[in-house]
Amino acid sequence: MAREFSLENTRNIGIMAHIDAGKTTATERILYYTGRIHKIGETHEGASQMDWMEQEQERGITITSAATTAQWKGHRVNIIDTPGHVDFTVEVERSLRVLDGAVAVLDAQSGVEPQTETVWRQATTYGVPRIVFVNKMDKIGADFLYSVGTIHDRLQANAHPIQLPIGAEDEFNGIIDLVEECAYMYGNDLGTDIQRVEIPEEHKELAEEYRGKLIEAVAELDEEMMMKYLEGEEITVEELKAGIRKATTSVEFFPVICGSAFKNKGVQILLDAVIDYLPSPLDVPAIKGTLPDTDEEVERKSSDEEPFSALAFKIMTDPYVGKLTFFRVYSGVLNSGSYVKNSTKGKRERVGRILQMHANSREEISTVYAGDIAAAVGLKDTTTGDTLCDEKSLVILESMEFPEPVISVAIEPKSKADQDKMGTALSKLSEEDPTFRAHTDQETGQTIIAGMGELHLDIIVDRMRREFKVEANVGAPQVAYRETFRAAAKVEGKFARQSGGRGQFGHVWIEFEPNEEGKGFEFENKIVGGVVPREYIPAVGAGLEDALKNGVLAGYPVVDIKAALVDGSYHDVDSSEMAFKIAASMALKAAVSKCNPVILEPMMKVEVVIPEEYMGDIMGDVTSRRGRVEGMEARGNAQVVRAMVPLSEMFGYATSLRSNTQGRGTFSMVFDHYEEVPKSVSEEIIKKNKGE
């Protein structure tokens, strides 16, 4: 089967936003107008095409990014709908890694919200070009220019409107196109009756002012246009479009458009903007990778002629076909039934069938080309972030980095029958989601699951019940504390057992010191003159790594420290790797008294939105939870409080906020960083963990 759409006419885009800004509805409408759905599903009725898991339909939020493909004006648009809820950041991170461009959806009443900032940061990390769609223009309190202002203030992004709304709230009935200098008026709410008209008289002045600002902003990034602009020459529509496209694809400029997906206004113009301004796979830099044997860096161009390479970015378990591996093809061509190499794991895999996904229905295809996104059936060993490539031309593409879980709960099956099923369920779920971990606690024998937040773990337990029929009891959430050292010291660890027969002997001197935040554990060998033989040195490092898993104060993992092996001694007969491992862990225990160990706790960036009259109560409540208020602002007729609060103090906050504001307050939180626990709290944690 020949290629249906050329690479230049392919767009791989993500739709990203804060929860409830209306992303899924926007995606639905795109599928409706591109002829993929015959009836529109509403999220708030639980009938949306993209939200296909039962819990998504019940909760009205998107959890897994469904990948789907649509066609518009001779172009193929592959869309990944990403979740906006903070607990699912990994889904967003995964999608952004394989996209070429994104549409950031904002709520016209709130503008940029905390999760928008997180997602925006992730997109900046991966260098993803973006268009901003200010949605919900029909909502009470909708304010387009306020929303644009929040993009400048909170994201420090060079964003400029390329459209202006005509009216707002109930009066929102048209859109001014600043590039083409015309207006589109909507005759009905189905979005089918659109008239292209001249800009209404009363809006002309504003339109001229903003078109001037737009040209100036684009000209600043384009020398030729700048010369024309300064000489007062007319800049044509084509030149302006080309200028916007160039600046957008190089991530220096973000066009802002408006509409109301729910009321079917502005969606077709959004699709036009995706085609006009977001990059094709040819416009983005070629993907970089390394050769497995030499670690030499290589590039794979987006072309069918290059050897095949692809990145697996999501694993899903499908009730009918089993394990689905979603992948993005960066170069070359892949036929179903062929063999590929998983270069990350060094395994050979057979691609049984290739499916093109459409929210939750699928169509089987025989070939995928460079730039395509599809799902493969039959891959056994491939997990998220693995590279698939041609067996004759190996390459490992840059993988993705995922955050560590911040919250854990103990979970136990209700019956013996559930016990076995639970193991299978947990391993399948952790295969799908790299930020979800499950392990057995060595001391208590309990199964512990860990994730990115309470909602994340709720949904995992819920999926165990629905998809794997496992009933389980869940304990109270536990915070993922960490420990670290604040002072440097040189300590000794000596393990000697020499009572007849073969003994054990290991002896080390280790210098511990604090490391930079986020750098983790670093081990250095500074032994001179072989006082500790070379073959035992890895054992010292391994012994320390093992010992660091259970910290010295309260048994939490120790992070961000440096250890240098500086001296020691050995015995010709009695020394062994095991003895040096034990000596190293003894040195770590000895460091407690000298290195000033402290406990660290996860701090959450919290944003609370409340009516003015509850301000005092909420501020008091935040402070009582050891929170630091970092800023306040008015947003429409509500107040927004931004604060840093320890995760341990945020359990049950939703209930307390509801009762403090009679259900009128909302909040969202995002993990930010680890911080030292105050002395009094630290003592309590130590007591609790020692069972006192």
From Swiss-Prot:
The keyword Cytoplasm applies. It is found in: Cytoplasm. GTP binds at residues 17-24, 81-85, 135-138. Residues 8-282 form the tr-type G domain. The keyword Cytoplasm applies. GO terms for molecular function: GTP binding; GTPase activity; translation elongation factor activity. CDD domains: EF-G, EFG_III, EFG_mtEFG1_IV, EFG_mtEFG_C, EFG_mtEFG_II. Keywords: Cytoplasm, Elongation factor, GTP-binding, Nucleotide-binding, Protein biosynthesis. One of its GO terms (cellular component) is cytoplasm. Pfam families: EFG_C, EFG_III, EFG_IV, GTP_EFTU, GTP_EFTU_D2. GO terms for biological process: ribosome disassembly. Its main location: cytoplasm. Disulfide bonds: none annotated. InterPro entries: EFG_II (IPR041095), EFG_III (IPR009022), EFG_III/V (IPR035647), EFG_IV (IPR047872), EFG_V (IPR035649), EFG_V-like (IPR000640), EFTu-like_2 (IPR004161), G_TR_CS (IPR031157). Transmembrane segments: none annotated. Belongs to the TRAFAC class translation factor GTPase superfamily. Classic translation factor GTPase family. EF-G/EF-2 subfamily. Catalyzes the GTP-dependent ribosomal translocation step during translation elongation. During this step, the ribosome changes from the pre-translocational (PRE) to the post-translocational (POST) state as the newly formed A-site-bound peptidyl-tRNA and P-site-bound deacylated tRNA move to the P and E sites, respectively. Catalyzes the coordinated movement of the two tRNA molecules, the mRNA and conformational changes in the ribosome. This is Elongation factor G. The gene is fusA.
